[in-house]
Amino acid sequence: YLQSAIRSVAFSRLWAMPQVEGYDTIVIYGDREHFSNVDYFTGYDARWEETLLILPRHGRPSILVGNEGIGYVKKVAVDIEVEFFQTFSLMGQPSDRSPRLKEILERRVVYDGGKIGVIGFKAYDASNHTVGGFITDVPHYMIETLCQVVPRDSLENATLLMADCRYGLKHCVSAKEIVIFEAAGTRISRGVLNCLRHLKPGMRE
């Protein structure tokens, strides 16, 4: 219930933002340490793998998952199409049953002459760096593959759509979401308190 209540409006909320004007598709990268942006829309935790969430303005969203994720993603409570991309798995695991990244992106990324937003971990001020143009922390091979599908100059770091303190989706919550977060936090803290109150010398896990 918590997942569906929060995320049922996440996609429409994104595309209703004035800051997404001109974007054809938003591509969101996540991994073990940085999956909150993907989680915001889907509830999916990449665990020890990587993941890529593709959100076209027109069309169904899709998510790329690895060997472990192909089973875990079934628990996602939103309507989303799943692409099996084994390169996102841990090293040494099978990688012979999924298409190449370019083939997937050609099917999933919608480009109508607008911008392609790329969301990674951080937004970057170009004035602080000696590299020009598009700056992102999304893995290089993914960006280069994306550039085989859409023009390089269409890419734009769109991380502020999630993280900007003034308008970022993760910083602007509804009254309903506040209630849900408070209820979840209270339930967890009570569970911890209950555990501590019942600890006794000599107890084992």
Model-derived regions, located:
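Solvent-exposed, amphipathic alpha-helical segments
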Residues: 187-201
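Short, intrinsically disordered, charge-balanced linker/junction segments flanking boundaries
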Residues: 1, 201-205
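A composition/biophysics-driven feature that prefers long, compositionally simple stretches
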Residues: 1-190
